[in-house]
Amino acid sequence: MNGSIQGKPLLGKGMSESLTGTLDAPFPEYQTLPADPMSVLHNWLERARRVGIREPRALALATADSQGRPSTRIVVISEISDAGVVFSTHAGSQKGRELLHNPWASGVLYWRETSQQIILNGQAVRLPNAKADDAWLKRPYATHPMSSVSRQSEELQDVQAMRNAARQLAELQGPLPRPEGYCVFELRLESLEFWGNGQERLHERLRYDRSDTGWNVRRLQP
């Protein structure tokens, strides 16, 4: 897709009155339309790191149960792969159970400081246990005890008992064995949208959709 954006703002900067970002956020890809969205994702994350976005990899991930009822939570993107983004969880958690029955998921990265967001849609695939072993050992060892004793998303009946169990494991120091349910998913992307706060409320939206031959890219109206 080719094209260019012409013309000048009529009313000065004219940014959205409903967003509170204070940092300039360059969006050169809106002009050049790169063929590969993963390169755009890498560029945005690197720029976010450089300008000091506090949690650039905090992804609001939405899944749905067998009846189509959605649920959302924040997960941390640990890796950008060729096919999508990687995150860790527990297989017995609500998201783990939902992804087992319905692998389709959608996530949003929102950066308040720059008034930017990235929407990621695709199918979540559980990766081999070797990948989970590696991810577990990369976590700070201080997180191992509670992650080992917790049965994520199950009812908590005795707070102190769980705390005591985690403290006992912490006395062992060093890494603990990976819990059986600790796993890693790759959200293999079928579409991405990069959103920037444009001038005169003409927000800059760049949409990528996977096709049989690669990616289709287009600008969207605000």
From Swiss-Prot:
Keyword Acetylation carried by entry: no
Domain of life: Bacteria
Sites where the protein binds substrate: S18, H90, R139, S147
Pfam families xref list: PNP_phzG_C (PF10590), PNPOx_N (PF01243)
UniProt GO MF annotations: FMN binding; pyridoxamine phosphate oxidase activity
Pathway info: Antibiotic biosynthesis; phenazine biosynthesis
Keywords linked to the UniProt accession: Antibiotic biosynthesis, Flavoprotein, FMN, Oxidoreductase, Virulence
Catalytic reaction annotation: (1R,6R)-1,4,5,5a,6,9-hexahydrophenazine-1,6-dicarboxylate + O2 = (1R,10aS)-1,4,10,10a-tetrahydrophenazine-1,6-dicarboxylate + H2O2; (1R,10aS)-1,4,10,10a-tetrahydrophenazine-1,6-dicarboxylate + O2 = (5aS)-5,5a-dihydrophenazine-1,6-dicarboxylate + H2O2; (1R,10aS)-1,4,10,10a-tetrahydrophenazine-1-carboxylate + O2 = (10aS)-10,10a-dihydrophenazine-1-carboxylate + H2O2; (1R)-1,4,5,10-tetrahydrophenazine-1-carboxylate + O2 = (10aS)-10,10a-dihydrophenazine-1-carboxylate + H2O2
InterPro entries registered for this protein in UniProt: Phenazine_biosynth_oxidase, Pyridox_Oxase, Pyridox_Oxase_CS, Pyridox_Oxase_N, Pyridoxamine_oxidase_dimer_C, Split_barrel_FMN-bd
EC numbers on record: 1.10.3.16
The protein's required cofactors: FMN
Binding site for FMN: R73, I74, V75, V76, S88, T89, Q94, K95, Q117, Q152, S153, R205
Keyword Flavoprotein: yes
Cofactor: binding details: Binds 1 FMN per subunit.
Enzyme class: oxidoreductase
GO biological process: phenazine biosynthetic process; pyridoxine biosynthetic process
Known partners and oligomeric status: Homodimer.
Functional description taken from the UniProt entry: Involved in the biosynthesis of the antibiotic phenazine, a nitrogen-containing heterocyclic molecule having important roles in virulence, competition and biological control. Catalyzes several oxidations in the terminal steps of core phenazine biosynthesis. It oxidizes both hexahydrophenazine-1,6-dicarboxylic acid (HHPDC) and tetrahydrophenazine-1-carboxylic acid (THPCA) and thereby contributes to the generation of both phenazine-1,6-dicarboxylic acid (PDC) and phenazine-1-carboxylic acid (PCA). It synthesizes phenazines in their reduced form, which are the likely end products in vivo.
Family from the record: Belongs to the pyridoxamine 5'-phosphate oxidase family.
Protein name per UniProt: Dihydrophenazinedicarboxylate synthase
Organism whose genome encodes this protein: Pseudomonas fluorescens
Taxonomic path: Bacteria, Pseudomonadati, Pseudomonadota, Gammaproteobacteria, Pseudomonadales
